[in-house]
């Protein structure tokens, strides 16, 4: 049986001035689903980085589109960010930029690739697919807070 979910799909021009619209939409969706404030802030950074990577690298001189799909599941939010621009080898880039040595000063960190490192750090799961363009699938699970009533855990989650 297929897992039940709701889907929200958006398309924006691959321009920096539209990234805030996606970030605000995602924050509203995540808030409605019951995500904690810190998790919403993490997802805002991750989706901004994914969209900014497309704006800076995917289309070069041409102006293309960014497709964003939110998959709202009971226990998680899946965010797909896709373009039809120039793609790159994520695994090769990942080897070049991470992991980082915490003893090195910030000045010695590489300038490129930090966005993908941030996304990988802030989200629970990330998948990169590249055929015609690049697709980034990010997943964040809802952390249910629990309180106890007479020794029995009670979820503070209210379903939407």
Swiss-Prot record:
<dbReference type="GO" id="GO:0016989">
    <property type="term" value="F:sigma factor antagonist activity"/>
</dbReference>
<dbReference type="GO" id="GO:0005524">
    <property type="term" value="F:ATP binding"/>
</dbReference>
<dbReference type="InterPro" id="IPR010193">
    <property type="entry name" value="RsbW"/>
</dbReference>
<keyword id="KW-0808">Transferase</keyword>
<dbReference type="InterPro" id="IPR050267">
    <property type="entry name" value="Anti-sigma-factor_SerPK"/>
</dbReference>
<comment type="similarity">
    <text>Belongs to the anti-sigma-factor family.</text>
</comment>
<keyword id="KW-0723">Serine/threonine-protein kinase</keyword>
<dbReference type="GO" id="GO:0004674">
    <property type="term" value="F:protein serine/threonine kinase activity"/>
</dbReference>
<keyword id="KW-0547">Nucleotide-binding</keyword>
<dbReference type="Pfam" id="PF13581">
    <property type="entry name" value="HATPase_c_2"/>
</dbReference>
<protein>
    <recommendedName>
        <fullName>Serine-protein kinase RsbW</fullName>
        <ecNumber>2.7.11.1</ecNumber>
    </recommendedName>
</protein>
<comment type="function">
    <text>Negative regulator of sigma-B activity. Phosphorylates and inactivates its specific antagonist protein, RsbV. Upon phosphorylation of RsbV, RsbW is released and binds to sigma-B, thereby blocking its ability to form an RNA polymerase holoenzyme (E-sigma-B).</text>
</comment>
<keyword id="KW-0418">Kinase</keyword>
<dbReference type="InterPro" id="IPR036890">
    <property type="entry name" value="HATPase_C_sf"/>
</dbReference>
<keyword id="KW-0067">ATP-binding</keyword>
<dbReference type="GO" id="GO:0106310">
    <property type="term" value="F:protein serine kinase activity"/>
</dbReference>
